[in-house]
Amino acid sequence: MAEEESEFLEAYAGIRTAYKAAMTQVDLAVSHEEQESPGQAIVAYELALRMIEDTFGIPVGLPNKIDTVQAEWNDACALIQKLKSAETELRYRLKVLRSQKQSIDDSAVEATEESRAEMDTKRPPLLAENPSTQYGIANASGAPKTYRELAAGLRELLAVRDAKVLLDELFRAQVKMYRIEASGSVTTISGSSTMSLVMCTVGGKWKYLSGIYFIQCSMPNEGTAGIWLYPLVPSITNCYQTEYGAFIFPDMECQQPGNAFGLMLTKEGQTSRTEDELEDLQQFFLDLLEAVLAGTVVQLKSPTSQRAGLASDTVSGSEQVSRHIVSAADFIASNLVRGAEKTGGFMLRSTPYIISKMTPASMDAQVPSSVQTSVEVAQKVTHAAAGMTGWIAGKVGTASMAVGRYLAPHIQEQGSKLLQKGFGYDTSEANSTMEGAMTIAAGAVEGVSTVFDGLETSAKILGSSLSENSVKIIEHKYGQQTGNLASGTFDTVGNVFVVSQNVNYITPKGIAKKMVKRTGEAVVSDYKRDLRKSESHYINAGSLYPDLRALKE
C-alpha cells in the first residue's frame, strides 16, 4: 500500500479513537446535567468541546487513490460530521446552562426553585437538535417555540389558502438539492428546482412566525404538495458554504444527528447566464444568508486547497513567505474583517505621509489610449444605463488589469534603483531583492483577495477610501494622466455599486473584491505561482466533508 494511503489510515485510526473519547465525555456532561449539577456539567461540556476541537485539528494525509480506502474515508467523514453536529448542540447547552446559572446567582432561592421546576418541564431533549428559539416568547403561554414547532407552523400556515400573510421573496434561483446522510452518503433529491429565500409577515394566531425567514424549494417529483421548507433562525441555524458552490444546512428536524441538506445553484433554464454571473449570484445568496443568520455562515475548504505542509528545501525564502501569507489569509478570512471603516480611516490618515516619502516622477507617464478609452466608456455607461450592469461588472476587471500591468514594471524598476542608491546594492543584488519582494507581494495580493471575502461593507468603504487616497498616491508618483485613469477606474466601481442595488447577481462585495484582486494579480502576475500547492498533502480532520462535486452535473 502506498505511503499516502498508510498515512491516511493512521490518521483515520486517530480520528476514531478521539471520537470515542469525545463522545464519552459528552455522555458524562449529559449525566451531570440530568443530575442537576450545572457547575459540573459546564466543566464537562467545556472539556468535551476542547476534545472535539482537538479532533478537528488532527492532520490527515490525503490518499492518492481514494478508492483503495473508500470505506475508511466515508467513515471518517461521517465521524467528523457527527462531531460537528455535537459541537453545535454542546455550545447551545453551554449557553443555556450559563444563563441559568447566572439567573440563579442573581435571584432569590425561592424564585429559582420555581423557575427550575418550570425549566424541567420545558427543557428540550438533550442533544436532539431541536433547540428553543426566541420566536413565540411574546405569546400568552410565554413559551418559546422549538425549531421543529416553527417548521411545522410554517407548513400549516402556508397550507391555509385564505391566511392573511405577506410573503416577501428576497431571492430566487434554480438549484439542485442533495441529501447528506450521517453515514457520509450523498443522494440527489431534486435534479432541478426553484429555490426562494422568503420573509414572512403575519398576525393573529400565527404572530409568532412574523419576521421569520425561510428557504423553500419546489419539489417537481413530489406532486403539487411537494415544497421543502427550511426556517433560518439566527444563533440556531448553521450554514456551511463549500468553495465549489454548495450551501449545506444541517437537518434540524431529523432525530438522528449528522444529517444535512445541500443546495447548489445552477444555470439550468437560464442558458444565457455566464459562469461569472453564476458566481455573483452565489455571492449575493451568501450575503443574504450572512445578514439573516447574523454572520454564522462557515466557509468550508475542500481538501485540495487545504494542503498545509510546505517543502522548505525546494522553494525560495520569498516564496515561503508568500505561501505563509496565503495560508494565514485562508485561515482568518471568515472571522477577520468586522471594522472596514477603520481601514478607510487609516488610509485617509496615512496617505499624506506616504506621499511625503515618495519622489514624484520627472514627467507624466504615458497611458495607452486604448486603456483610457475603456475607462471613459465604463464611466459613461455606468452613469447612463442601468441595463448594462452586467457588462460593466466585467469591464471593471479589464480596467483594473490594465492599471496593474502598467504599474508593475515601474514598481520593480524604481524599487531596484532605490536599493542601489540608498543601500549600496549592486544591480544584480538589487534586482534579485526586488524580485523576492514581488514574490512576497504576490502572496500578499492573494491573501488580501482572500481576506476581502470576509468584508461585509466593502464597496461603500473601498469606493471612498481607494478613490480618495490611492488615486492621490498614483497621481503623485506617476503623474496626472495615470491618476486620471485610476480615478476613472475607481469611479467605475462606485457607479456599478449604485446600479447593482437593483440587480440580484452583483453585490458590492463582489465588485470590490473583483477590482482589488484583478489589479493586484496584474501587478504581480509574473511572480505568482500556485501558492497553495505544495509537496505535502495534509488537511485538518475538520475539513473532511462528503464531496458534492461528483453530483454537480
From Swiss-Prot:
Pfam families per the UniProt record, alphabetical: Senescence
Gene Ontology molecular function terms on file: small GTPase binding
SMART domains in the record: MIT
Residue stretches of biased makeup (Basic and acidic residues): 113-123
GO biological process, one term: negative regulation of BMP signaling pathway
Domain named Senescence: residues: 325-509
Effect of I325V: In RNA edited version
Localization in the cell: Presynaptic cell membrane; Early endosome; Lipid droplet
Region forming the signal peptide: none
GO cellular component term, pick one: mitochondrion
Keyword Membrane (UniProt): yes
Span list, region Disordered: 105-130
Record keywords: Cell membrane, Cell projection, Developmental protein, Endosome, Lipid droplet, Membrane, Neurodegeneration, Neurogenesis, Synapse
InterPro entries noted in UniProt: MIT_dom (IPR007330), Senescence/spartin_C (IPR009686), Spartin-like (IPR045036)
Superkingdom as given in the UniProt entry: Eukaryota
Expression across tissues: Expressed in larval brain, ventral nerve cord and neuropil (at protein level).
Location, primary (coarse class): membrane
Function: During postembryonic development, functions with endocytic adapter Eps-15 in neurons to restrain synaptic growth, by inhibiting BMP signaling, and to control synaptic endocytosis. Required presynaptically for neuromuscular junction (NMJ) neurotransmission. Inhibits neuronal BMP signaling by promoting endocytic internalization and subsequent endosomal trafficking of the BMP receptor wit. In this way, regulates the Fmr1 translational regulator controlling Futsch expression to modulate neuronal microtubule stability, which controls both synaptogenesis and neuronal survival.
Assembly behavior: Interacts with Eps-15 (via C-terminal region); the interaction is required for spartin localization to the NMJ presynaptic membrane.
Protein known as: Protein spartin
Species annotation: Drosophila melanogaster
